[in-house]
């Protein structure tokens, strides 16, 4: 038994123990540790999934936010559930925990800050801020660093999906793709395109490619870059953004065509919660024997 307990830290395995007339199946699971950078609403969904037992093969060991109170709130919830979670005040402190995975739910700027150091640290990344990967030079650096260090960067689907069919259609050749996003005018406040007239009239506020879109809306259209990286690339992905008075939530519609396939992935979400749950799904896929 002592030998088995020692081996349990190396890999998951099961064995049978007989006690009297009863037999018990004992399973040791190799737990993965992860940390979160960015402690807003989406990070809260992921941490609550841990608390509710939806991620049984994971241990959340640390959280980091530029607003320390937000990190403390998540760590406090973990403590209430009897789970230890460190509040980190710097990126170096977070990576010093040597997590298997870094979950990034902050911003493209945060991904730029964390990606290369994390991958060199032996830490794979699950990210929602895919907009940072529109930059080809940064994208290549991330890919090369991951290869050199045996790590990976997992792109969560966020508020869209269908990356498998997008990639498949693109691999077949001669593919074109376009992305359509509809949102309410309030969601555009603070951006260069916002004007009060949008509160009363429907208007296309942007047309261009995914690189131009993420440059103009650095936190609003990460999904366009994700869909483009799964298919035709950020320069070739054509993007249209429409503002509709009174519209709540987001419609994300990506369309891809080649000589044989025409596919449309159309997702409406009233809130951003689907993005947080897409991280939970990605984490499950990483450890699942069956991957969707």
Model segments located where?
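Active-site-lining helix/loop region of Rossmann-like oxidoreductase modules
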Residues: 37, 154, 159-292
